From Swiss-Prot:
Classification of source organism: Bacteria, Pseudomonadati, Chlamydiota, Chlamydiia, Parachlamydiales
Gene Ontology MF: a single term: flavin adenine dinucleotide binding
Protein name in the entry: tRNA uridine 5-carboxymethylaminomethyl modification enzyme MnmG
Chain sites annotated for binding NAD(+): 275-289
GO cellular component: cytosol
Pfam families according to UniProt: GIDA, GIDA_C_1st, SAM_GIDA_C
Keyword field: Cytoplasm, FAD, Flavoprotein, NAD, tRNA processing
Family annotation (NCBIfam families): mnmG_gidA (TIGR00136)
PROSITE patterns recorded: GIDA_1 (PS01280), GIDA_2 (PS01281)
Organism this protein belongs to: Protochlamydia amoebophila (strain UWE25)
Annotated binding of FAD, by residue: G16, G17, G18, H19, A20, G21, I128, S183, Q372
SMART domains: GIDA_assoc_3
InterPro entries: FAD/NAD-bd_sf, GIDA_C_N, MnmG, MnmG-rel, MnmG-rel_CS, MnmG_C, MnmG_C_subdom, MnmG_C_subdom_sf
Gene3D superfamilies in the cross-refs: FAD/NAD(P)-binding domain, GidA associated domain, C-terminal subdomain, tRNA uridine 5-carboxymethylaminomethyl modification enzyme MnmG/GidA
Gene: mnmG
GO terms, biological process: tRNA methylation; tRNA wobble uridine modification
Amino acid sequence: MMLWKFPVRYDVIVIGGGHAGCEAALASARMGLRTLLLTMNLDTIAKMSCNPAVGGIAKGHIVREIDALGGEMGKVIDVTGIQYRMLNATKGPAVWAPRAQADKLAYQSEMKHRMERVSNLDIKQGTIEDLLIENDHICGVITKEGISYDCQAIVLSSGTFLRGLLHIGETNYSGGRAGDQPSVGMSASLEKYGLKLGRLKTGTPPRINKRSIDFSCTEEQPGDPGVKFSYDNEGIPRLPQVSCYITYTTEETKQIILSNIHRSPMYSGKIKGVGPRYCPSIEDKVVRFSDKERHQIFLEPEGLQTQEVYVNGVSSSLPFDVQLAFIKSIPALRHAEIMRPAYAIEYDYVISGQIDFSLECKKIGGLFLAGQINGTSGYEEAAGQGLMAGINAANKVMGKAPLILKRSEAYIGVMIDDLVTKGLDEPYRMFTSRAEHRLLLRQDNADLRLRRYGYEVGLVDQTRYDRVKEKQRIMEEESERLAKTFKQVSNKGYTLTQLLCRPENTYASLLKEYPDVMQNFGEEINFQIELNLKYAGYIDRQTSEVAKLAHVEKIQIPIGFDFSTVNGLRNEAKQKLNQIAPRHLGQALRISGVSPADISILMIALTRYQEPIEKERLTSDCSEA
């Protein structure tokens, strides 16, 4: 094939225009690097291929962290959402999670519009056929259209497109998702350069016509007021808000599915990829939970300008006639019209152990991976990885150290640490239970935790950084003042802190009761002061646990350290440690197959390894003196 060389040499090329690719491209360009986003179709940038929603349990935390670091997802959903809710609001604050129903076409359009306005960012349509690599380092790409682009780093965020195969009953065909072609050349290129690929599976439910739903048989679910994702979107106008609706499957639904289970490619053996355990298809639900009488379904509008409704809870790969039959077995959907059928999709991903904590490939320098190619599922998980990959690709080009978030700092840090240190046997989904220090990683304090990093890499401007520093100052000073200010209650003196910590009291109620001594800093700051004081004991305990682990995290492991030379380490530990190459002892401790006894042996070995290096350094210093 004759190639035409594009005359501009880019610093960073981002492959794929999904949620990971958007964040990666924006981060790299805003950090001052000449960036190119290459995607197969400019009309599908930021497309919501599955559910029309952003956020949810743990996922909402990630979106707020993306925003705190200077990313875009939270800002876009705040202006394109058609319903907002705070999930788990009746539980403890560690698991409260914002979720928004999106107008998915508005979301796509808004994200694309924002990207097109960013200087340093070029957006072009093209399908990647091959990577250009010299001396084990990325140097460019070749497209199907016969164009070669040179660069210094690449972020690959291919979603479900790598050798994608769609399944609807006995029918299957190649595709990246419904209506889009797959990427075949990229998979072959990755294998050619030594990366090991596996297969995963995900699925999506049918979309039905809103006019065909009997809403009298459903339970209305309105949104919650005051929920937002971005720390910078105060007072912005919002789209008209709508409700979602709840309904349930029936015994008839169950029998229809069970009598046709042999026609499901999941159960006939046609699908080889592993699906997400925590987002099962309706086939899996009726088989695995056979004692359950019914399963909950959420009817979610896909936008203000469409009649399509997403039937959340019935992801399926059954044939269309079976889909139609089980949908019509639900009372609210007796007359339902399916506008788009459900389907399952298999796709390639890079098997665990081949990227480091910066998301850079170990075998190919300058190649960063983000999103479903790393084995994750979900828009939010992809966007979080995309942001970090974009930051670290830019840092590599500029000769700077990568930004690596700790598990105690962010859910994004937990996710990436898990992806690197733990093997995946199914699509990875973030849960609050994966984080050891959930009370420190609340959705409300992401700006206090992470905005500094966004400022340091150049994604957060001085004004926004000053705002969070001022917020921190107010919270600290007010907490001290509340602990020193007394009020008489039933002839007994109590500090305002003591009164606030009573279960029946809130910051808002004390503002009304004691307006002479309570100060109003706005709902957000008032709320955080209240949480920090009410949960002070638990927060202090988790902070202490983090401090205890810090000394293990500080014991660095030299780059290129050969674990096979350490006497006493079990063979499994040697293999896993050499494969993953942890940067410090804390990461080594979390690797599956590495025991506490292995860590003790490794700690001694590292001490001995460092002794001659330290002695040589001291000798050198003395000679120079």
